[in-house]
C-alpha cells in the first residue's frame, strides 16, 4: 500500500512489486542501503499481501499470520529432491507466529477446483522475503489477506478490504 495510507504508524513502507525476483531484489537493496550510507539491518520485516485460499483452514475475506513458507513452483523430484526443495538450498522456511503454510510461486494460483493438504495459502512473494530475512537474521512476520480461491475476478474485488484489515492489525501492535 502507499506510504500516505499508513501515516501515523511507526513503519517504513516498501513496495516490492510482484513475484519472487522483485521481492528479493527490492528487499535486499533496502537492507544493503538501509540508511543510505552503510548496511543497517531493520529490527523486523513485516510483509502484507493477498493470497489465494488453498485449504479449508482459511476463509476468503479473512486476514491470517503465516508461520512457514515453501516454493510451490520448485519441483526437481526427478533428481531425488523433495517437492518444493531447492537443490542444495532451502526447503521450508519457518518464521512468524502463525501456523499456516504459504506456498509462493511466480504464477497466479488457479486451484479453485481442488484444495490441498500441503499448504494453506498461495502467493507470489512471501518465500522470497522470508529467505532474504533468514539470510540476514532479520525477524520476519507475514500477514496474508485471503482474497480469492484461485479466481482472478475475486482478487480484484477483495484487495481493498484486506488493506483495511491489515492497517487495523498493525495499529493494534504499534
Label each residue range with its predicted role.
Residues 1-3:
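N-terminal beta1-alpha1 ligand-phosphate binding loop
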Residues 5-174:
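Glycine-rich phosphate- or other oxyanion-binding loops that anchor nucleotides, phosphorylated ligands
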Amino acid at each position: 500500500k502507499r506510504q500516505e495510507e499508513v501515516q501515523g504508524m511507526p513503519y517504513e513502507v516498501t513496495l516490492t512489486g510482484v513475484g519472487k525476483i522483485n521481492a528479493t531484489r527490492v528487499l535486499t537493496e533496502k537492507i544493503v542501503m538501509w540508511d543510505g550510507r552503510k548496511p543497517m539491518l531493520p529490527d523486523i520485516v513485516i510483509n502484507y499481501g493477498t493470497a489465494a485460499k488453498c485449504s479449508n483452514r482459511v476463509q476468503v475475506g479473512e486476514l491470517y499470520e503465516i508461520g512457514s513458507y515453501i516454493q510451490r513452483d520448485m519441483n526437481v523430484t526427478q533428481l531425488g529432491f523433495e517437492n518444493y526443495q531447492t537443490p542444495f538450498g532451502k526447503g521450508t522456511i519457518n518464521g512468524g507466529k502463525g501456523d499456516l503454510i504459504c506456498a509462493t510461486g511466480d504464477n497466479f494460483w488457479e486451484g479453485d477446483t481442488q484444495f490441498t493438504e500441503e499448504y494453506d495459502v498461495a502467493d507470489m512473494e512471501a518465500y522470497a522475503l522470508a529467505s532474504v530475512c533468514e539470510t540476514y537474521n532479520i525477524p520476519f512476520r507475514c500477514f496474508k489477506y485471503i482474497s480469492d480461491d484461485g479466481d482472478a475476478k475475486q482478487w480484484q474485488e477483495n484487495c481493498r478490504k484486506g488493506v483495511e484489515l491489515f492497517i487495523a492489525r498493525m495499529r493494534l501492535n504499534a
